[in-house]
UniProtKB/Swiss-Prot annotation:
Family: Belongs to the universal ribosomal protein uS5 family.
Protein name (record): Small ribosomal subunit protein uS5
A Pfam family of this chain: Ribosomal_S5_C
GO biological process: translation
CC annotations in GO: small ribosomal subunit
Gene: rpsE
Keywords, ordered alphabetically: Ribonucleoprotein, Ribosomal protein, RNA-binding, rRNA-binding
Purpose of the protein: With S4 and S12 plays an important role in translational accuracy. Located at the back of the 30S subunit body where it stabilizes the conformation of the head with respect to the body.
Assembly, per entry: Part of the 30S ribosomal subunit. Contacts proteins S4 and S8.
InterPro entries cross-referenced by the UniProt entry: Ribosomal_Su5_D2-typ_SF (IPR020568), Ribosomal_uS5 (IPR000851), Ribosomal_uS5_bac-type (IPR005712), Ribosomal_uS5_C (IPR005324), Ribosomal_uS5_N (IPR013810), Ribosomal_uS5_N_CS (IPR018192), Ribsml_uS5_D2-typ_fold_subgr (IPR014721)
Superkingdom as given in the UniProt entry: Bacteria
Amino acid sequence: MGAKDLNQRIDAKRIEQGITTLDDIQFEERLLEAARTTRVTKGGKRFSFSALVVIGDKRGYVGFGLGKAREVPLSIAKAIEDAKKKTIRVPIVNGTIPHDVVGEYGSARIIAFPARRGTGVIAGGAAKPIFELAGYTDVLTKVVGSSNHHNVVRAVFDALLKLRDIDAIAKVKGATVEDLRERYNIYAR
């Protein structure tokens, strides 16, 4: 799956959720990576900076963005603006994810499981701040393959886009919420 495909899925999710403006939401930002790149020209070296940022309100809204500029603060500001454009709402059930999910991007793969209350966010690298800023307090994850921050972030968002709450699953299956809870023994009451 490429970046275009993921961005299209994020846009579709935003439309499905009816997210148009996020001005009234207070976001917390975390800088995951700041990198300096150098372009050598006949006039000398030209430096450029890129920043990978995750934003979230710890109540279900989370997004990521990439910004590039000649100066670090400008690249971070651009990344935050990009993250606001890619913000989605994720389902939270008793502080954890509603069901097991696997996300992939490139050679990075993340497997996430719901956890009992008090477990905490067990995640490594770039995955932990995403789950924390989304508002999850208990979740178990494992990153397999590439640990590159860019790929891991996109793999996590691929997983988050696959999450469905019990009402959405019941609607698709044509069953009631109570039937699903009894049949599959899932979702805390």
